């Protein structure tokens, strides 16, 4: 019998399909030679993995440790890693023979009729008992690498889950540091507001005394009282904002706000760290989110090979050892073995399998673009953090002078007003200028510290690429 022509060509087409392997995608993005910011340091030293200690705050150290042990986000990320580990074990199992053991017992009794070969109504054998034991093993020969690719995909997904956990940890610690710094800054702003309120109340007492003696008008008295009321209004606003940061901080730590440790640190005691940014080409090995995107891309590439292998025949080998008897005592008296082999090739479902391959290839293309996006986003994160560090540093140099000159102006205006040589309007202006300058000074100091946190995070927080999971 002659085979149809298209079936004769099937082995050749399968061989050609098996020999064509997918070309691994390239990154397609060349890192720049250096950072755009002129203040970027090209020192090769990585940030310390305990980067928060650079702020010299024992309270921040304590909060980070609480977050490490208590955070529900970190616990959820760890659970996702365990899920990926289980999937990797499941995906690797088909590479090994599947062995099963069976022990069966059955009993049949003829109720009516003439029976059959085992149950004969004309004899006394109206009941049949059998016992069987068997040990079987089956194994699929991985000719096309589909099973190995499925295992590799699961292992790369496991890598991605572990790297995601590192990203969650870095983000969590950065958020804890940011919120803690904001909390201290609000306490400092509250202290400044209280100090300026006392200054405004002292001027109000002076205006009231001058008004009683006829040296000041009712208008001047109302103006100063308005300024005092405005300063009073700032206090509950700042207290509310500080309470909000406490709630946010407690949530990050996985605690109710009532259990949040009491802070006694002063904002001025914090140290501003200088951070070496290195060069852009090093960033690819420093960021866990980039490594996770790369691992997902590798998993998608392996999935393409799995889809390609599904189009090819599968060869399965099997062996079974067994024995059976009519009594349990003789169950191993009649041993036997069975050898099997099977070849299965898709015929009528090739359209579905082709679509599955196209789906895997499209997912690979999507993850390649996501990988490229993560690289560009990482470069942008560092550039923005460097720009913020440089910009705030330059502003603070002038802000310190503004605070000093505003303080001198207020003191001079107050003395001249007491002497009757200056109007209250000048005193009011210098009071407002001093408060605004001091408040802005605290805000800039916070921005400077938060820019350092952002730069630590942008550089990967001291994380280094480990060898992939094997």
From Swiss-Prot:
Protein name: Pyoverdine export outer membrane protein OpmQ
Assembly with partners or alone: Part of the tripartite efflux system PvdRT-OpmQ, which is composed of an inner membrane component with both ATPase and permease domains, PvdT, a periplasmic membrane fusion protein, PvdR, and an outer membrane component, OpmQ.
Purpose of the protein: Part of the tripartite efflux system PvdRT-OpmQ required for the secretion into the extracellular milieu of the siderophore pyoverdine (PVD), which is involved in iron acquisition. The system is responsible for export of newly synthesized PVD after the final steps of biosynthesis have taken place in the periplasm. It is also responsible for recycling of PVD after internalization of ferri-PVD into the periplasm by the outer-membrane receptor FpvA and release of iron from PVD, thus making PVD available for new cycles of iron uptake. Contributes to resistance against ampicillin.
Induction: Expression is stimulated by iron limitation.
InterPro entries documented for this protein: OMF, OMP_efflux, RND_efflux_OM_lipoprot_NodT
Listed Pfam families: OEP
PANTHER family: BLR4455 PROTEIN, OUTER MEMBRANE CATION EFFLUX PROTEIN
Coiled-coil portions: none
SUPFAM superfamilies to which the protein is assigned, alphabetical: Outer membrane efflux proteins (OEP)
NCBIfam families: outer_NodT (TIGR01845)
Annotated Gene3D superfamilies: Outer membrane efflux proteins (OEP) (2.20.200.10)
Gene that encodes the chain: opmQ
Keyword vocabulary terms for this entry: Cell outer membrane, Lipoprotein, Membrane, Palmitate, Signal, Transmembrane, Transmembrane beta strand
GO molecular function: efflux transmembrane transporter activity
Signal peptide start and end residues: 1-18
Subcellular location: Cell outer membrane
Membrane topology reported for the UniProt record: Lipid-anchor
Lipid-acceptor residues (N-palmitoyl cysteine): 19
Source species of the chain: Pseudomonas putida (strain ATCC 47054 / DSM 6125 / CFBP 8728 / NCIMB 11950 / KT2440)
Family: Belongs to the outer membrane factor (OMF) (TC 1.B.17) family.
GO CC, any one term: cell outer membrane
Disruption-associated phenotype: Deletion of pvdRT-opmQ leads to reduced amounts of PVD in the medium and decreased growth under iron limitation. Deletion of both PvdRT-OpmQ and MdtABC-OpmB systems strongly affects growth under iron limitation as well as PVD secretion.
Lipidation (S-diacylglycerol cysteine): 19
